[in-house]
Amino acid sequence: MLLPLQLDAIQSPHMITSAKNQRIKDAQKLSRKRHREQTQTLLLEGLRLVRDAVESGVRPQTIFYAPTQLANAPDTADFLAQLDKAGIECMPCSEAVFAALANTITPQGIAAIVPLPQLALPAHPSLTLILDRVRDPGNAGTLLRSAEAAGVAQVLFAPDTVDPFNDKAMRAAMGAHFRLPLRVCAHWEELEPLLPPHAPCYLAEANAALAYDQVEWRASAVLVVGGEATGASQTAMQMATPIAIPMLGHTESLNASIAGAVILFEAARQRRRNVL
């Protein structure tokens, strides 16, 4: 069994055994939006998320790992050895220190500091998703995951919307941040120039007269999904045509992330088959 050898072979400083270590304290600060913006970095936790970032071309600045937690995780240990071989700083931590660093209830023993994703926006986006006043990070992350799967060209975060780099949003997106161009816009004046000119804009709205599957999605288009508690902003309502998902049961509306996914995959269906 080569696993213990692989872990021992990683060239790294002495194990961090105190949560007061400055490197740990600096990493913990990345749970705050302000610090993420100041450093232009974020903390990823778990093998799936770190691997997705690396496979998307991201080079981690630092890896933190708990050797005892990886003793029965050969895939993680192999991946860690590859990162070390590539010259990436790998810092071992005690289980207690890693638990203090982690944001999950059951940490997987690996975390990484990486640059904030900044993929270039497309010059001529085919389908744009706008998140408007979506404040739940789980919904935002799930919408990003669905958008990437449905072939959305770009995602724009309107004012008064959750930070897409919130740790819960990152986990819910399952790596979509590293494959999908997105921008956070503090003002609508920043957002509007990023939209394709003359493209129709639609707003998911429970009581709209127009059904989502009666819309022409094959050409360039924009979809706005508003928050569940407060709905979309006045700006979005003025610029977009409302569309609804007809309900057959007694449920009045769907969760924002589910509604967004239903509409996005209708757009994907039309584009894939080139039919309305």
Where are these regions (language model features)?
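Short pre-catalytic strand/loop immediately N-terminal to key active-site residues, enriched for Gly-Thr
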Residues: 40, 130-135, 244-252
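Active-site/ligand-binding-proximal alpha/beta "capping" segment
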Residues: 203-251
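RNA substrate-binding interface of SAM-dependent RNA methyltransferases
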Residues: 10, 55, 91, 96, ...
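Amphipathic alpha-helical repeat scaffolds
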Residues: 46, 135-142, 253-259
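Structured adenosyl-cofactor binding patch, chiefly the S-adenosyl-L-methionine
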Residues: 112, 149-150, 161-177, 234-276
